[in-house]
Amino acid sequence: DAISIDEVHLDMDDDCKYALVIQDFHTGDPIDLLRSRRTSVTEPYFVSIPATERNQVKYLISDMYNPYIAYVEKYFPNAVPVVDSFHVIQWITRSIDNYVRQLLKKYRQHDREYQDKLSYEQQRPVSLPPSDEVYLLQKYRWLILSNQSNIRYHSDPRMDSHFHVLMNTYDYEDALFRIDPNLKDFRDLKEMYVQFNSRNGGNPLLARNELKELIQTYKSSRNFEHFRNRFLFATRQTPVLNGITDYNPVAYYEEDDF
């Protein structure tokens, strides 16, 4: 009653770059392998399967590739799309990294403009070290992107070559959060999802209740809307995450909204 859809890069020829892998979600056994994920290949294949068989599928597990999610509406009317947790956390981490990179780009631009200003005023080339923001975002953004359980925090201070003061891991983390408060919100949300998965992987009822509490906690956050809709529901009107079937519809967002 649950199948997984994914692609594998083969690049055998122009018509066989990404093959489509169909698996039994419970056993992991392959059901079939299609030479391409193109509609011209997948549509005739799925349509050829008797409707009585397709109607027995309750869950379609995939990444956030919208054409895969659309298979539910087109071929599996009794199923709900499910985004696997690996791709959810991958999307969250990538989104946070993109946000950090935009901050880094902004502060680098500030550095260049300030350096140009000094060079003009002094009528000679001026070279400046990176600003505190650029230094932190460039060298320590891993503190935000990594799972906290994988970070080895050290409390013993060490001399920092940029700030010329003794600092430990907690100091760098606090300094990053002072650059932009959103960074802490995003990191905390990521950690809530990681912990949610580790606690509730085998208990749908507990997962459903905690998910509701998580949503309640963050529903008033001005930064949470885009995260919530994509990270839980992958741009569909009523998809389900991790097979939880008691869900609430959410606003639909197009790709351009992100």
Question: Where are each of the predicted segments found?
Answer:
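Flexible glycine-/small-residue-rich
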Residues: 7-9, 22-25
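Catalytic cores of nucleotide-enabled group-transfer and carboxylate-activating enzymes in metabolic
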Residues: 8, 81-82
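Structural motif
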Residues: 39-46
